[in-house]
C-alpha cells in the first residue's frame, strides 16, 4: 500500500480545521521536521522530509528524512544504531511543518557528532561579536568509530 498525500487546500480554514492531512511541501518538495524526545521533550534535531520520507515514517513509525546535502532518503540511525521510533506525529496549523516525538535507540544520541541533541551550543555575544559556547560536551558515542569511511 502506497501512501499518497492529497494536494493541500487553498482554503486556510480547511488546512486549520479539517480532518484531512494534506502536508504543504515547499518548492523543492520538502517539509521541515522538528524532532523532540518523547519522554523529556528535549529538542533533538531539525531535518527535512520529502513525501516518501514522510510516508515511510507514518507507515513504519521509524523516522526517515531527506538529506539535502546527499540528495537522498535517509533512515535516521541506520548506520549508528540510534534509530528513532516515532511515538507521535503532529503538524502545525497550516500543515507546512511536522513535529515528531521519538524514542532514540542505541546510544540515545541523535547528532552525528555523538551528542544527544544537535543543539549542543548556545549563541552568545562576547565583545560585540556572536560566538558559540558548548553547553553539552558529553559524547554518547565516538563518531570516528561509527562513521568510518
Swiss-Prot record:
Pfam family, one: PRA-CH
EC number: 3.5.4.19
Catalysis performed (reactions): 1-(5-phospho-beta-D-ribosyl)-5'-AMP + H2O = 1-(5-phospho-beta-D-ribosyl)-5-[(5-phospho-beta-D-ribosylamino)methylideneamino]imidazole-4-carboxamide
Cofactors (names): Mg(2+); Zn(2+)
Pathway in which the depicted protein is active: Amino-acid biosynthesis; L-histidine biosynthesis; L-histidine from 5-phospho-alpha-D-ribose 1-diphosphate: step 3/9
Alphabetized SUPFAM superfamilies for the sequence: HisI-like (SSF141734)
Any Gene Ontology CC annotation: cytoplasm
Biological process annotations from GO: L-histidine biosynthetic process
Binding-site list for Mg(2+): 92, 94, 96
Family: Belongs to the PRA-CH family.
Protein name: Phosphoribosyl-AMP cyclohydrolase
Underlying gene: hisI
